[in-house]
Amino acid sequence: EKLLTEETEKLGFAQARFKLEINPAEPGPNGADKLQILFSANPGVPLKLLQDVASSGEICRVMLAVKTVLAEADEIPVLIFDEIDANIGGETAMRVGAEIASLGRNKQVICISHLPQVVRLAERHFLVAKSTDGVETRSRIGVLDDAQRVQELARMLGGGDAALKHAEALLKER
């Protein structure tokens, strides 16, 4: 609980509280315990089941915090996040990006994201492009060079000259 609280503070939860409840469950492929995460994002609000009270963006950040805590103990060399930054933006997205980049110092991290605040911190930036001929949809993936990366971040920011300047600034801040 302490480690989870510390990690979520980094992700923008200044006063969140957690309680982990471990209850016996029918033994199966996932073990013989059932873990429930009780959560409160704000002081004075009682702890309740995470899935009942947290927004989708809050759940994503809590899951990133859980993965971060577990990654320190696990010997798993690769972490894959598929839109772990969903439904967040602004300063929170910057914090999430920094946490993912921090994980990448000791693990191989593959992160699928639509947020320029997160993408800018990637060591390598890949673009997945879909195309269709009306019958089939195909996906292509390719690594972006520095110039293409600026263009892609600018596109993600909405396009235009201001977005291009913003993309260049974001990449310089890395």
Report the location of each language-model feature:
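Amphipathic alpha-helical domain-onset/packing element
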Residues: 1-25
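Short flexible coil/turn linkers enriched for glycine and charged/polar residues
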Residues: 10-16, 28-33, 43-46, 58, ...
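C-terminal lobe/lid and adjacent interdomain/linker elements of RecA-like ASCE P-loop ATPase modules
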Residues: 35, 91-174
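GG-anchored amphipathic helix commonly corresponding to the ABC/SMC/Rad50 NBD signature/C-loop
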Residues: 37, 41-43, 57-79
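Walker B catalytic acidic pair
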Residues: 82-83
